[in-house]
Amino acid sequence: MSLLIACSIGVCNGAAASQPAAPPAGYKIEEKYTRKSPDGATTIEQYLNKDTDDWKWQFWARRQDAFTLLDPEPAGYPADFIFTNDLKWIVRVQKIGSGTSTLHLYRLTPQGYLRANRKPLGDLAWDYLKTRRDWRKLVKAPEYHDSAYLVDGFDENYRGLGVDWPANRYLLIALSGDADVRGRKPMQTGVVNGWRCRYDLQTGKFDVPALFSGDNAKAVVPE
C-alpha cells in the first residue's frame, strides 16, 4: 500500500512568491550552527531571535544569487541539515521538544531551496503509519516523545541493508513514540519502537519494503 503526498514533487504553490528578502528584525545569525553543502555551493544559516518569550529560529539557504527562507514557521531549536548526494534535496532534522524530533524536506528549484511539502516530512510519515495494519495493533496511540528520524545509511543509499536501490531516490524514515499504558509498569511505554518506511523522492509516495515487514510487526506494542 502506498500513499501519495500532495505537493511533494513540485514546490508548494505560493512558496516562492511569499519569500521575504532577509531575516526580520531581532534575528541574528548563530554562526556555530552554519552548515555547508559538500560542494560548498550552498550555505545554511541559522538565525536566532532572543527578543521573544520563547526563542525562535529561522533557517536560510544561500546559493549563488538566491537567499531563501526554508520554512516560514520558526522553530524552537537549532537543526541539523543533510544533503542528498546529488544536492537536489535537503533533509532538516529538527528537535521539537524533550525526546521529540521530526524531519522537514526541501527541494532545489530555480529560486533556490524551498519546501517540498506543506507538512513536515515526519508528520507525513506518521500519517502513512496510520493507514497501515500495524497502527491498528497498537495498545494506545503515542502521546509524547513521538519522533521521526532518518535510518542510518542515507549517504551510501542504504547498501549496508543489502539493497541495490537507485542513487538519491529514497529516504528511510523510522518512527518512535511513547504513551502511558494503564497496567504497565512503568506506565510510560514505548508503543512505537523504530517502525520504518521508505519515502520515494521521485514519486512522493511512501511504502514499506518487504525486508522491514518482520521488524515492523515487532516495533508496535500490541494490545
Model-predicted segments: where are they?
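Short coil/turn segments at the loop-to-beta-strand junctions that recur within blades
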Residues: 73-79, 120-125
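Beta-strand-rich domains and repeat architectures in extracellular enzymes and scaffolds
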Residues: 24-56
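Recurrent small/Gly-Pro-centered beta-turn motifs in extracellular repeat architectures
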Residues: 47, 93-94, 174-175
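Surface loop/turn motifs at the tips and blade-to-blade linkers of beta-strand repeat domains
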Residues: 26, 70-75
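Acidic, small-residue rich beta-repeat scaffolds with periodic aromatic anchors
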Residues: 5-7, 12-36, 102, 106, ...
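Residue-level detector of Asp-centered blade-edge/turn motifs that repeat once per structural unit
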Residues: 85-86
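Short glycine/acidic-enriched loop and turn motifs that connect beta-strands
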Residues: 49-53, 96-99, 178-182
